[in-house]
Amino acid sequence: MSTSHVATKDQSVVRSLLRLWPYVRPVRVRLFSAAVVAIVASCMSLVIPLVLKWMVDGPVSDRDTGGIWLGAFVLLILGIAEAILFGFRRWLVARPLAGVEARMRAALFAHLQRLPMAFHDRWASGQLLSRGTTDLMLVRMFLAFPLTFLLVNGTTILVGFIILLWQEWTLGLVLLAPIVPLFILCSYFESRYSVAARQAQDQVGDLTTVVEESVLGIRIVKGFGRNRSQARAFHELARKLRGTELVKARLLAGIWAAVTVLPEIAVGGALVLGTVQVADGALSAGTLVAFLSTALALRWPVESIGFLLAMSQEAATATNRYFEVMDVEPESATPGGPTEQDDTSAAATAKPSLDKAATKGEMRFEGVEFRYPDAAPDSVPVLARIDLAVRPGETMALVGGTGSGKTTLTALVPRLHEVTAGRITLDGEDIARLPRERLRSLVSVAFEEPTLFSATVAENVLMGSDAAAPGDLERALDVAQASFVHALPQGGDTEVGEQGLSLSGGQRQRLALARAVVGRPRFLVLDDPLSALDVHTEALVEAALRQVLKETTALVVAHRPSTVLLADRVALLSQGRIAAVGTHQELLRTNAEYAWLMSGAETTTDPERASGAGSTVPAPAVESPLEGNVR
């Protein structure tokens, strides 16, 4: 089941945002320069009231026209300089922060490739997509604006109040009165807004999941007429997201009103008190004008506190969500050993083992046991006491009923999952000790459900081998009987579209098979590779596949008797255990469950008839249609 929301330890906003430092560090000089430029620009706005004071107490009082024009010119220069500096600040941060976002997204993508299959089994794709898109956009916006202006506005407010207290300390104290209630309100706002922000960003992930599933499954949606049910699911999630966004809007409106009204009341009180002082002659008109102008210059820095805190909280939440994925341990190269991040370097420095050209091709399962990572320790394992030897150059078929563990067993060979106990060896080498990159260059896999990417036919097939020669592509297509490729508009250069849905199921499966054999692997694992083929195409593929299987050691999951005939021997898997091993003909004669499976009775007969798995009692009542044809 996919995970949508992950419980994490509460962290302060500052502590969460500090985790961005490794990504920000390369551009720290540009960000620091931008902050300095913004501080200088903001401080220029505080110089304007001082110029006004000089003009009112000097040229205006003395009716000095020249002085007035000079003051106006200075004000114009200050305004233009402030605008230029703020524009320069934006230029300084635009490119570096786009790079930070790109690096974080690339790091997330690379990390996802290294995470174990158990992680991908649990997590909804929409949650991962939202972390790589919406969340990183929020982080970039924070670095571009709130990060700088929390510093700039804080500095501006500090310098501004120093000037106010220097101009007239009694009026300055009046303006300082709202600080305590504002601090309390901001703390309350931050605690409430953080909850709403996290909920909204999780809901965006849920909504993304529904949209993605509906688009990828559009054939099912339309085929079963589920448009309305999918629309209801979408609208329900959209309604919840809308409600959460309204909660955020109400909180933001409340804090905005508070940080606007309380300072305005203080400014009004200072204006009344200042007017009285001017009337009493205790204060000059120019000083009052300068004081009020300075107070008004601080209006925007104070009023912006609300939405800057909101954006910071959203960025902190986005950062936490990002690191929820990045903190997951990647697959280790060996149990308890280095992570897969170190696989490449380890493989490069270690002495090569299992050279592809020199391998004999023996595959062994020794006491293998497996249970999924999220299963209870005392739960029944999916696979138990698996002992199986596949000789070099041999093809071993895996046969078993639904849920017997066939697909799980094949997934252990390329280490898509790690064995819980026991070991799997290739030519005596424990695969747990092989770097994954090395292991997967030796083992090629074709899954029952073929997955194609939004790329060309050739690119999809050549994913099976980095070193494939041009002739290997044609050979692989011939083996998979994928001659339809040559009839496509651009042949092998034809784009197959997302998930390869422009092709039929059989065509996708043939391309997946071609991908598995293109690299001439030493070990081949096929999970029912012919299930989507018609009888005629299946016969052609089997004929070509026989030649490939002569050159490799293969483990083939088989459901059809015709696929079983490709194998030298058959292993019967029942309830997660190896019930019997032998040739097809031997098992037909000696094992009732195998004979029942091969007869096709699985769909019409009570499976309890075959409960005696591994029994050597003959089953004369069940005769395979192939028995008489086997030599």
Predicted regions and their residues:
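ABC-type nucleotide-binding domain
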Residues: 341-631
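An intracellular "coupling" helix at the cytosolic face of ABC transporter transmembrane type-1 domains
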Residues: 21, 25, 117-121, 134-143, ...
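Transmembrane helices of ABC transporter permease
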Residues: 26, 30-43, 81, 145-199, ...
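Membrane-integrated ABC transporters
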Residues: 1-45, 60, 64-74, 89-93, ...
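Alpha-helical segments in transporter systems
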Residues: 18, 29-50, 54, 71, ...
